[in-house]
């Protein structure tokens, strides 16, 4: 700067008669000065321009454009999924290139209703939070009989009255038989969900996600609340949690599980999460993964690896649902559905349950933890899980009268006596720990299609292969399945009366425990396995918490119910 000032000073002397060299130098400096002046003038003008234009852009033009866009969005036709086209375009620009066509890309989602479609790759405990809205409301009350979600449920004083959402995230052949009717000339080709995925091949993703999106909807939770229920037990297989190699549709169900919990919250319904299928299959049954496969705690290296993998899953899952937003709604956590005590070492299963309990607690889940009785009954669990060392534990008992040749063959009134007397006494005398009935149904036969596996018949009418053609109905001859499988509108009055008594006797007995969950909320066509269908047909009480006086266990010996002893098979 000083050199420039000196040059300018010397040039001022030009008029005082400086030499030609100095004159030439001064002309060069004059050019530089002119250029600097021009640049400074431009810069000042630009600043003035921006000071005027920028406020106009941010205060007038952009808000006006946003207003126009909102109006266009309001009037624009939506796609058949209910998503505005502009929103789709906007969302697609949010998804980074590396996430395109991944589980995080909302443009690949079949449905975006009630999902937060703002892109995020955030995780908690290794599980994606994609699709969840930040805000939630825990002030909702399912019915006047129970407290709102933000107040503690009085477990042990007020029975749970709930229903299962089975056959949804964890598919089962008898619940949705239409998926499993694939066969050739000699045999059925699809026996379980994983073989269904394999059969569908490249179509598996679209077919299975469509099932996720339609079999359980927002309306489902509204109807459950309308039926007077207050809990839902959501069953799921491990492969929905995150991508893995066991199936090409893995990971998709996770966001549907999270959305369903929010739908339950909106209706004031508390959730019992239940792992229904563990790595390797914990029981070899069709709802555990691959039918007739059991590589879980079976004494093999692979079985041990899978049992430890299951604990790792609980570490992630329990940590995720220990978050504050879930404490009022996910109040029960199931360790594992129906591990096979008939085949596996019961001591190993018991030890594994202790490990699972420890992992879940160390992951900061503070709610109730349920352990399956594995069909062993409610007794003797206190020898292994004393309340001091294992607080807030539930024994999950499943009760059916149709999978046992003796029980299924009893006459109608005798079945009611088993429920009202035998089961009632068993719960009273043997259930030393808090006990729930995690599954029960209205079915008095095993006639539902594919109930005993795809392509297998029924004990009731003698078509169940292991029974060698021997029917199990009380008459042993002339046993038919058509009466149980027909439309309930065609049921005879005596059969309707019996089924209602079968329902209310179980409710009365199970209300004396910590509560119950009916299996299942809905099916494609098996009425007696569907709470919804049976409820609409008048075979269940109008409100689960308010049973009528039409039947109770004390009425079994009254003359009006002696007819159950006299009637033949329906």
From Swiss-Prot:
- Which InterPro entries does this chain map to? Glycoside_hydrolase_SF (IPR017853), Glycosyl_hydrolase_5 (IPR050386)
Q: Name one GO cellular component term.
A: division septum
Active site positions, chain numbering: 338 (proton donor), 439 (nucleophile)
Superkingdom of origin: Eukaryota
The record's GO molecular-function terms, alphabetically, read: glucan exo-1,3-beta-glucosidase activity
Sugar attachment sites: 91, 116, 121, 184, 203, 248, 364, 525, 552
In its UniProt record, which GO terms are filed under biological process? Answer: fungal-type cell wall disassembly involved in conjugation with cellular fusion; fungal-type cell wall organization; glucan catabolic process
Question: What top-tier enzyme class does this entry carry?
Answer: hydrolase
Q: Recorded E.C. number(s)? A: 3.2.1.58
Indicate where this protein resides in the cell: Secreted
Give the UniProt keywords, A-Z: Cell wall biogenesis/degradation, Glycoprotein, Glycosidase, Hydrolase, Secreted, Signal
The reaction(s) annotated as catalysed by this protein in its Swiss-Prot or TrEMBL entry are: Successive hydrolysis of beta-D-glucose units from the non-reducing ends of (1->3)-beta-D-glucans, releasing alpha-glucose
Q: Which Gene3D superfamilies does the record match to this protein? A: Glycosidases
- Its family? Belongs to the glycosyl hydrolase 5 (cellulase A) family.
Which protein are we looking at?
Glucan 1,3-beta-glucosidase 2
């Amino acid at each position: 700067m000083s050199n420039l000032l000196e040059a300018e000073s010397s040039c001022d002397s030009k008029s005082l008669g400086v030499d030609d060299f100095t004159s030439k130098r001064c002309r060069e400096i004059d050019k530089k000065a002119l250029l600097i002046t021009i640049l400074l003038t431009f810069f000042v003008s630009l600043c003035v321009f921006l000071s005027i234009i920028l406020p106009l852009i941010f205060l007038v033009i952009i808000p006006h454009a946003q207003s126009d866009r909102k109006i266009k969005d309001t009037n624009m036709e939506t796609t058949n999924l209910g998503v505005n086209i502009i929103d789709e375009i906007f969302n697609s620009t949010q998804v980074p290139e590396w996430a395109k066509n991944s589980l995080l890309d909302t443009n690949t989602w079949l449905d975006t209703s009630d999902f937060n479609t703002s892109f995020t790759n955030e995780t908690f405990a290794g599980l994606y939070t994609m699709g969840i809205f930040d805000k939630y409301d825990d002030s909702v009350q399912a019915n006047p009989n129970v407290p709102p979600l933000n107040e503690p449920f009085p477990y042990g004083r007020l029975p749970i009255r709930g229903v299962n959402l089975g056959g949804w995230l964890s598919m089962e052949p008898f619940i949705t038989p239409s998926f499993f009717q694939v066969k050739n000339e000699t045999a059925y080709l699809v026996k379980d969900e994983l073989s269904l995925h394999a059969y569908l091949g490249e179509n598996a993703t679209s077919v299975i996600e469509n099932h996720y999106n339609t079999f359980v909807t927002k309306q489902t939770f509204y109807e459950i609340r309308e039926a007077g229920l207050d809990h839902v037990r959501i069953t799921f297989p491990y492969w929905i949690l995150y991508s893995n190699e066991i199936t090409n549709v893995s990971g998709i169900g996770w966001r549907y599980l999270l959305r369903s919990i929010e739908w339950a919250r909106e209706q004031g319904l508390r959730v019992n999460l239940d792992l229904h299928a563990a790595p390797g299959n914990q029981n070899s049954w069709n709802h555990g993964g691959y039918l007739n496969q059991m590589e879980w705690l079976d004494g093999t290296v692979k079985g041990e690896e899978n049992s430890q993998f299951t604990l790792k899953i609980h570490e992630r899952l329990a940590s995720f649902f220990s978050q504050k937003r879930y404490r009022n709604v996910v109040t029960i956590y199931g360790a594992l559905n129906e591990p096979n005590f008939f085949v596996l070492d019961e001591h190993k299963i018991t030890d594994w349950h202790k490990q699972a309990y420890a992992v879940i607690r160390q992951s900061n889940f503070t709610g109730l933890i349920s352990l399956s009785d594995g069909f062993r009954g409610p007794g003797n669990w206190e020898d292994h899980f004393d309340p001091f060392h294992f607080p807030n534990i539930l024994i999950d008992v499943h009760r059916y009268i149709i999978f046992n040749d003796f029980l299924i063959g009893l006459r109608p009134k005798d079945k009611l006596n088993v429920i009202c007397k035998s089961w009632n006494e068993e719960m009273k005398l043997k259930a030393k720990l808090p006990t729930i009935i995690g599954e029960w149904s209205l079915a008095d036969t095993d006639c539902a299609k594919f109930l005993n596996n795809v392509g297998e018949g029924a004990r009731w009418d003698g078509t169940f292969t292991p029974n060698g053609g021997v029917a199990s109905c009380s008459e042993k001859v002339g046993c038919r399945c058509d009466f149980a499988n027909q439309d309930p509108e065609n049921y005879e009055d005596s059969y309707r009366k019996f089924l209602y008594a079968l329902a209310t006797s179980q409710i009365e007995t199970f209300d004396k425990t910590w509560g119950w969950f009916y299996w299942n909320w809905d099916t494609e066509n098996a009425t007696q396995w569907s709470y919804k269908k049976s409820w609409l047909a008048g075979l269940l009480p109008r409100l689960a918490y308010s049973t009528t006086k039409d039947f109770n266990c004390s009425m079994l010996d009254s003359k009006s119910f002696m007819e159950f002893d006299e009637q033949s098979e329906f």
